[in-house]
Each structure stands twice: as structure tokens, then as C-alpha cells.
């Protein structure tokens, strides 16, 4: 008599879940670029600062860059940072800087052009030129930062990114710059009479269309190099931060899909702000919240069984200041143990 079909699978072992920490990221010494991102308000900055702290214990030099206009890393470390890498107080090898790529190229005011028909026509052509490659100003801002950072030879760079849309533009900036440069080369003769004036207004000095194109071309080798590194899982990874709620889970899935399209490696998720009720101190609100979060945690574990999913607790205090960041950072390597009844 034939054996039931299920018998051959009866003793098959369950798939072991991956370690629920960021140890794999800390231990991967080949990594040069680590992005931390997700929906707004989920604790990206706390997680990225904590990751940078742990990396500083095992790497020669670590730089954390905030590309979020909110610039929360100054709040997290309780220290003001600027566009220049600044040493974080209390560390010898951890540096931080804050940039706002969205400022890029400001819109030119009408007053500059007055009533002159020729200048008015020039403005229209400039607007047409800039609109031909949307995002070029932001992308060039990223490109300049990358050029500077590459020259500083930090052993690893952590990006505390802005909410998802900005993050995807950051990861796509090499493509945007190359496309924009190609478009500029096509129309440079058309806009040449006005390029010098535009450059003066943007603070780039005297420059004609050929010089501007040449200046952009100088950054292309760096941009292409960074682009290749971004797509190399040995050098780049992305850590998604979320909370156990529907919208955050949805945004995380969308982000992971977009990262796959960009060929960016990602195999770590941090689920932050989890509520763990204390059996000795019953709280109906906490228990209700825990029940909701548990439902979405189960979904995440089913959906992302090939990811390291770190679970971090909601704390009764802000994670602010070097000492608090230090303490919180240990949770990235040691799974949190919730209170249990005796």
C-alpha cells in the first residue's frame, strides 16, 4: 500500500528564523554605505544613531549623515551639527553631518527679469532647461556630498534618510544626474546666451554652457563609482524601520519593492515602539495595543522570513543624549526581553 503523500514531509524541520538583531550588519566589515529609512515618525533617527554608535566600536571611522530636513540627529546626540563632518562628543571615531538636498537650486524670482522681453524669454528657456531633467538640483546636491565623503575615506557611512520618497531619490541620484547631463548637452547651444547669467545668480561664477557641462562631467566618474557600490550587497545595504501598524507595514513593503527595482540589498527590518505589557501591572490600553501589534508582527514574520527582524520596545522616555543613545544601541544586538510574571 502506498504511503500517504504527507509522510515524506512529516519530519521536515521548520525553517529557523534569522537572528532578530543587526549583528549581521555590524559584523559585515565590507559594508561602506548603510541606509536607514522608512515612514515618518517610526524612529529612524534613533535607530540610525544607535547603529552608528555600535559601528564605532568595531570600525576605524564612522560618519552618520542626515538627509532629512528635520535634522533630528542633532536632537538625538544633543549636539548641533552642520554641513561639515563634526566629531560627536564622547567619541573619537564617530562623526556627524546634516544636509538638506531639497534646497538645491532655488526658483529664480521674477523681479530679476523686470520687463525686458529678451530676459523674460531667457527665463522661460531656463525653466524649460531645468524642467527637462526634474530632480537634477537635488541629485547634484547628493553628488557633491558623495564626492566629498568619498574623499574623506570613512570606513563606513550611515545615512539617516528622509521619509520614503526622498530616500528613493537619494538612491536614484546617479541615474538622474547622468540623464540630466545628457539632456544638458543636447540643449546647451540653445541656452548658451543665458547660462552665464543663470550661473552668476546661482553663485557659480562666470561660466558658459561648455564649462558647466565640463564641471558636471568631472563628477560623473565619482557618481558612476558610487552607483556601482550602491548595487553591490558587499558594500551597501538598506535597513527598513517601521512600527507594527497597517500603514507602516504597507509602506515598508512598498519600500522593499522599490529597493529591489533599484538593485539595493536589504535584509534587515527594525520593528520599533513595541508595547510589552507587564503582567504584574495590568493595563487595558497596553494589552489592546499589544494585541494589535502582535497581529502585524505575525504578518511581518510570515512575509519576511528571509529578513533579520529586530524588535525594539516603546520606552517611557526620549532617547536623547549620548548616554541614552548608547544604552538604546545595545538593543540592536541583544533581543529585548519583555517583563514576565513570576
UniProtKB/Swiss-Prot annotation:
ATP binds at residues 39-40, 43-46, 245, 272, 313, 315. GO terms for molecular function: ATP binding; ATP hydrolysis activity; metal ion binding. It holds the Pfam family ArsA_ATPase. Gene3D superfamilies: P-loop containing nucleotide triphosphate hydrolases. Its main location: cytoplasm. InterPro entries: Anion-transp_ATPase-like_dom, ATPase_ArsA/GET3, ATPase_ArsA/GET3_euk, P-loop_NTPase. Its EC number is 3.6.4.-. It is found in: Cytoplasm; Endoplasmic reticulum; Nucleus, Nucleolus. SUPFAM superfamilies: P-loop containing nucleoside triphosphate hydrolases (SSF52540). It comes from the Eukaryota. One of its GO terms (biological process) is tail-anchored membrane protein insertion into ER membrane. Keywords: ATP-binding, Cytoplasm, Endoplasmic reticulum, Hydrolase, Metal-binding, Nucleotide-binding, Nucleus, Transport, Zinc. It catalyses: ATP + H2O = ADP + phosphate + H(+). Homodimer. Component of the Golgi to ER traffic (GET) complex, which is composed of GET1/WRB, CAMLG/GET2 and GET3/TRC40. Within the complex, CAMLG and GET1 form a heterotetramer which is stabilized by phosphatidylinositol binding and which binds to the GET3 homodimer. ATPase required for the post-translational delivery of tail-anchored (TA) proteins to the endoplasmic reticulum. Recognizes and selectively binds the transmembrane domain of TA proteins in the cytosol. This complex then targets to the endoplasmic reticulum by membrane-bound receptors GET1/WRB and CAMLG/GET2, where the tail-anchored protein is released for insertion. This process is regulated by ATP binding and hydrolysis. ATP binding drives the homodimer towards the closed dimer state, facilitating recognition of newly synthesized TA membrane proteins. PANTHER family: ARSENICAL PUMP-DRIVING ATPASE ARSENITE-TRANSLOCATING ATPASE, ATPASE GET3. This is ATPase GET3. It comes from Xenopus laevis (African clawed frog). The lineage of its organism: Eukaryota, Metazoa, Chordata, Craniata, Vertebrata. The gene is get3.
